[in-house]
């Protein structure tokens, strides 16, 4: 354990608060949830509830390297966020900007091949089977006139 406490720790290219427990701080990284963070901490032999700022420089480096290549830690495939990648055919786990870019590319690919989901994305409609009759409306709302105002309008008009 290092002698000093760090309030900001850089892990896998992301600045994380050092005053949070390891699993909750790691959950601030896009693509890492609490369950994944707990599994990674367990595989590396780190206490999941130890404050992130108390980790030594070597432990932080080990953690960053593990997060960059989560697939190699031996986690079960259902824990990974990109199983059976359609282009590479392998199970992967993406984090940070890699995840955002891949999701954007997937949506563009769906639009390009004009799949049902791609067409829904193109039209700006809901994609996952939600109802659209009443919810998700866009544009201006049409107001409803009330009693007295309605009566005055009928007399005048």
Curated annotation (Swiss-Prot):
MF-aspect GO terms: rRNA binding; structural constituent of ribosome
Gene Ontology terms describing biological process: translation
Positions of transmembrane segments: none
Keywords: Ribonucleoprotein, Ribosomal protein, RNA-binding, rRNA-binding
PROSITE patterns listed in its UniProt record: RIBOSOMAL_S13_1 (PS00646), RIBOSOMAL_S13_2 (PS50159)
Listed InterPro entries: Rbsml_uS13_C (IPR027437), Ribosomal_uS13 (IPR001892), Ribosomal_uS13-like_H2TH (IPR010979), Ribosomal_uS13_archaeal (IPR019977), Ribosomal_uS13_CS (IPR018269)
Gene3D superfamilies on file: 1.10.8.50, 30s ribosomal protein s13, domain 2 (4.10.910.10)
Pfam families documented for this protein: Ribosomal_S13 (PF00416)
Signal sequence coordinates: none
GO cellular component: cytosol; small ribosomal subunit
Similarity field: Belongs to the universal ribosomal protein uS13 family.
NCBIfam families recorded: PRK04053.1, uS13_arch
Job description of the protein: Located at the top of the head of the 30S subunit, it contacts several helices of the 16S rRNA. In the 70S ribosome it contacts the 23S rRNA (bridge B1a) and protein L5 of the 50S subunit (bridge B1b), connecting the 2 subunits; these bridges are implicated in subunit movement.
Annotated PANTHER family: 30S RIBOSOMAL PROTEIN S13/40S RIBOSOMAL PROTEIN S18, SMALL RIBOSOMAL SUBUNIT PROTEIN US13
Complexes and interactors: Part of the 30S ribosomal subunit. Forms a loose heterodimer with protein S19. Forms two bridges to the 50S subunit in the 70S ribosome.
Protein name in UniProt: Small ribosomal subunit protein uS13
Lineage: Archaea, Thermoproteota, Thermoprotei, Thermofilales, Thermofilaceae
């Amino acid at each position: 354990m290092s002698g000093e406490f760090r309030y900001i720790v850089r892990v896998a290219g992301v600045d994380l608060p050092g005053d949070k427990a390891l699993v909750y701080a790691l959950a601030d990284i896009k693509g890492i949830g609490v369950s994944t963070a707990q599994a990674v901490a367990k595989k590396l032999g780190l206490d999941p509830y130890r404050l992130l700022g108390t980790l030594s420089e070597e432990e932080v480096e080990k953690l960053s390297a593990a997060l960059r290549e989560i697939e190699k830690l031996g986690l079960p495939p259902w824990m990974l966020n990109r199983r059976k990648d359609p282009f590479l055919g392998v199970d992967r786990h993406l984090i940070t900007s890699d995840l955002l870019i891949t999701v954007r590319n997937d949506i563009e690919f769906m639009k390009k091949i004009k799949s049902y989901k791609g067409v829904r994305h193109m039209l700006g409609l809901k994609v996952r089977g939600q109802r659209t009759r009443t919810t998700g409306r866009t544009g201006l709302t049409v107001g409803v006139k009330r009693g007295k105002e309605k009566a005055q309008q009928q007399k005048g008009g």
